[in-house]
Curated annotation (Swiss-Prot):
Disulfide bonds: none
Gene: omp2b
The organism of origin for this protein: Brucella canis (strain ATCC 23365 / NCTC 10854 / RM-666)
Pfam short name (any one): Porin_2
Biological role stated in the UniProt entry: Forms passive diffusion pores that allow small molecular weight hydrophilic materials across the outer membrane.
Domain of life the protein comes from: Bacteria
Keywords associated with the record: Cell outer membrane, Ion transport, Membrane, Porin, Signal, Transmembrane, Transmembrane beta strand, Transport
Full protein name: Porin Omp2b
Length: 362
């Protein structure tokens, strides 16, 4: 066998082997078409369909940084330096349609950090303010809502003014476990009934931080509202099962123009003490009022004043300025006069304080 024959035989063997391997080769399947995310506009901006479902999802929230100086207008004490705090709030909302109505969920997870004027981590003034908390988590089917949310005593009539220090004179506890049902008519009328567990994170006159029910009897809240293009009027009544007392609020909002609106709220408590779940103002009664003026597309001026039966007066004003869409800077100044029965609970009768808030919402 000569060299030429050997080379020809080797080449033939290689060709045959290559043909056999080609016959046995695995053919990769064609890639499946990608199903792009679909926009869902049934529940507002920012929702999209979860792929493969008819459920709409929205991820939103905000990042906030606050700097406070001057006096603490809630306690009257002198800060003697800057208090700083930061928060990242992550919110997830879902919505879908069912044979029983719209099914929604809402959750909010808050990551908080604070440092007081001495630079001590975890402190904001005299309070511990760092940590992570599941602030809200509820399910809603039609008008039925169950889970952790804010009390209907607050939300049904509407929050106080668009100021940061809005609750120097408190209008009641906020977060609570609850089962509520809201009826909404087509003529502007609505009504609510709620069974609530009681607040768990609000301090009262004596420093109490837990207003949970202590048995099987829940707190009960009921309210009525009428709303139109001119504004709204609402009333709410709450029964505190722990102290077996009740509190009530009535509020009116009026839209003077498209840019200018005013509101007024009055409240009464049968217990006449702020150390309770609902009527947390001083004495029998309290009154709040405020206004909002949208000066330009970017700047809004807000003013709020309040006074209670025990003699506390609180006034706050701010300007919320949107530098760019989603980023707002709010400088605010507040004044509190501790008169009457409040004078014995604070170090100073008069308190002036300021805060600047930087917030990016998305």
């Amino acid at each position: 066998m000569n060299i030429k024959s050997l080379l020809l035989g080797s080449a033939a063997a290689l060709v045959a082997a290559s043909g056999a391997q080609a016959a046995d080769a695995i053919v990769a399947p064609e890639p499946e078409a990608v199903e792009y995310v679909r926009v869902c506009d049934a529940y507002g901006a920012g929702y999209f369909y979860i792929p493969g479902t008819e459920t709409c999802l929205r991820v939103h929230g905000y990042v906030r940084y606050d700097v406070k100086g001057g006096d603490d207008v809630y306690t009257g004490s002198d800060r003697k330096g800057w208090d700083k705090s930061a928060r990242f709030a992550l919110r997830v909302s879902t919505g879908s349609e069912t044979e029983l109505g719209t099914l929604k969920t809402f959750t909010e997870l808050r990551f908080n950090y604070a440092a007081n004027n001495s630079g001590v981590d975890g402190k904001y003034g005299n309070e511990t303010s760092s940590g992570t908390v599941m602030e809200f988590a509820y399910i809603q089917l039609g008008g039925l809502r169950v889970g952790i949310d804010e009390s209907e005593f607050h939300t049904f009539t509407g929050y106080l003014g668009d100021v940061i220090n809005d609750d120097v004179i408190s209008a009641g506890s906020y977060r609570t476990g609850k089962i509520s049902y809201t009826f909404t008519g087509g003529n502007g009328f609505s009504a609510v009934i709620a069974l609530e567990q009681g607040g768990d994170n609000d301090g009262g006159y004596t420093g109490t931080t837990n207003y949970h029910i202590d048995g099987y009897m829940p707190d009960v809240v009921g309210g009525l509202k009428y709303a139109g293009g001119w504004g709204s009027i609402a009333g709410v009544v709450a029964y505190d099962s722990v102290i077996e007392e009740w509190a009530a609020k009535v509020r009116g909002d009026v839209n003077i123009t498209d840019q200018f609106s005013v509101w007024l709220q009055g409240a009464y408590s049968s217990a006449a003490t702020p150390d309770q779940n609902y009527g947390q103002w001083g004495g029998d009664w309290a009154v709040w009022g405020g206004l909002k003026y949208q000066a330009t597309q970017k700047a809004a001026f807000n003013l709020q004043a309040a006074h209670d039966d025990w003699g506390k007066t609180a006034v706050t004003a701010n300007v919320a300025y949107e530098l760019v869409p989603g980023f707002t800077v709010t400088p605010e100044v507040s004044y509190t006069k501790f008169g009457g029965e409040w004078k014995n609970t604070v170090a100073e009768d008069n308190a002036w304080g300021g805060i600047v808030r930087f917030q990016r919402s998305f």
